[in-house]
Amino acid sequence: MSLHSKLSESLKAYADLDKTVKEIEEQVSSMEEPVPKTVKYVTFEENLSEEEWESDSGDDDEDSIDDSLIPDYLRESSSITVDEDEEDQKEDMEEHLPTVSWEEEPTGIDIGFGPGIVMPSVSNHEGGTYVRYNGLGGVDPNCKDLISKMMRSLIGQIGNKYGYDIDLFDYQGDFLEVFLPHKPSKEDVRPDIRIGKKNEEGTSKQVSKPRGKEKIVLKTGDECGRFPMNKEAKKREPEGLWEVMKVLSVQFDPWKEDEPPLSLTIRDLFISESEFRLHCNHSQTEREMALVGIKLRRLYNKLYQKYRL
């Protein structure tokens, strides 16, 4: 195609476009109500006497205007819309915004999730604590299924191993709600409790032996001072808890068929002992809270490396 033919086609297209624009302008102008060009003036008749003028003016109101003199496009519509105040609109918008309520919990649960994944909400209830993970509705479906599957596997292991009736509620995949009971459903068989009993028996036998002065440091919580420790926690030795916990493994069902199950230890999931202490309390259900409160970002990284999600 020569340059001349290209130029001619461009000019033809431009002419068609100009014609289309003019047609649209004509249609718009025809839709608008035309403004009357004639102007009507109100004049006084000189031959009108004062009595006649007073009688005419008495019938009508002083501020009344002849409706025939008002153009149609200036007449008021029957319906009047009143905008609400901006403050009321802001209050209505704030009521519909998603909020996460945080309260001081005697059990000291800290989920440890950042706002980038899910936002947890903790609330007390008779006999236990509810932990609700909001924000799962916007997560990728594969990740959401993985999180739900991971939580179910983890909660089943905790309940079977330590005798806690932990329930998981999954409402259409939008959020997960975990119920942590305050008391186990059967006798506590945790090794640290047994160690504590042996230590108490040993100390009762060695009462007569003199001891030197020992400095007793009572911890009031974690590094941020969030979790106040109760009397039961002060009596026990929290140092032995990490030694037991870091070797515990959490085994998850394989994400794909013909794949071995994924087994991770608490040491793999937590960075250090200090981070572990930030995610569990030394009062009653340390293992359960630590396992439920592991950071999903670290677990997801492990799963991603293994299954290439």
From Swiss-Prot:
Keyword Phosphoprotein attached: yes
GO biological process entries: viral transcription
InterPro entries associated with the record: Phosphoprotein_C_viral
Compartment(s) of residence: Virion; Host cytoplasm
Residues where Phosphoserine is found: S272
Record's compositionally biased regions (Acidic residues): 47-66, 82-94
Record-annotated disulphide pairs: none
GO annotation, cellular component aspect: host cell cytoplasm; virion component
Top-rank taxon, per record: Viruses
Sites bearing Phosphotyrosine, chain numbering: Y14
Gene3D superfamilies per the UniProt record, alphabetical: Vesicular stomatitis virus phosphoprotein C-terminal domain
Keyword line: Chaperone, Host cytoplasm, Phosphoprotein, Viral RNA replication, Viral transcription, Virion
Region feature (Disordered): 38-98
PTM comment: Phosphorylated by host kinases. Phosphorylation play an important role in facilitating trimerization and possibly P-L complex formation.
UniProt subunit comment: Homotrimer. This trimer is stabilized by binding to the L protein. Binds N(0), and N in ribonucleocapsid. May bind to host ref(2)P.
Its job: Essential component of the RNA polymerase transcription and replication complex. Binds the viral ribonucleocapsid and positions the L polymerase on the template. May act as a chaperone for newly synthesized free N protein, so-called N(0). Plays a role in virion assembly.
Family per similarity comment: Belongs to the vesiculovirus protein P family.
Protein name (database record): Phosphoprotein
Lineage, broadest ranks: Viruses, Riboviria, Orthornavirae, Negarnaviricota, Haploviricotina
Gene that this polypeptide is encoded by: P
